Amino acid sequence: MKNLKQTTILFLSFLAITLQSCNSSNVDKADKYYKDDNVPEAIKHYELAIAEGDTTATNKLALLYTNEHQPEKAKEVYIKSFEKGNMEAAQYLANVSLRDEKYNDVIKYAKPLADKGNKEIVYALGSAYLKLTQYDDAIKYLKMDAGNVYVKDPLGQAYYDKKDYINAEKYWKSAVDDHQSGAINSYNKLLNLYKEQNRQKDYDAYNGRY
């Protein structure tokens, strides 16, 4: 019984090493084929590596399709990867869905990541909720990365759309005051807010800052 157990462990170890070697071999071959402009063979070997469970091959194949101006094929690769539990794929799909204005898809891909504390995804998720006029959810997630200059723009907008002008001003003003770049949207919205509220003195103080 002991010998059988040891034999089983050795076999599983050998199998794992063999699979890892095959994966690496197929990825290496695909890399070489792509470097040599043999796209069909590169795709073939990336797909073989993916079938063997290599997640790096997924990213490389999607990047290949992106570089070859086939974004829909890249998206298909990531969707299949997401369905297998690849969270890197979820991040890519969330950002692509935001670009394509498919806001419910953004939530589908991004919310599980954000709920686990991933701050990199909250801009896309919060922006999607904002577009769907779900302001409380937008604020909830955007505040996870409220120090980010790019996040301050939609965060301020969510408050503005709720008619909470004090907090809208707070975040837009912070973007302009605390960041040397990246705040142009917040800057323009801050000036428009001051104009709407007939706050000429504040408008003059910030006009020309960016």
Predicted features by range, described:
Residues K35-D36, L48, N67-E68, R99-D100, ...:
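Register position in tetratricopeptide repeats
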Residues E52-D54, K84-N86, G117-N118, G147-V149, ...:
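Short helix-capping/linker turns of helical repeat alpha-solenoids
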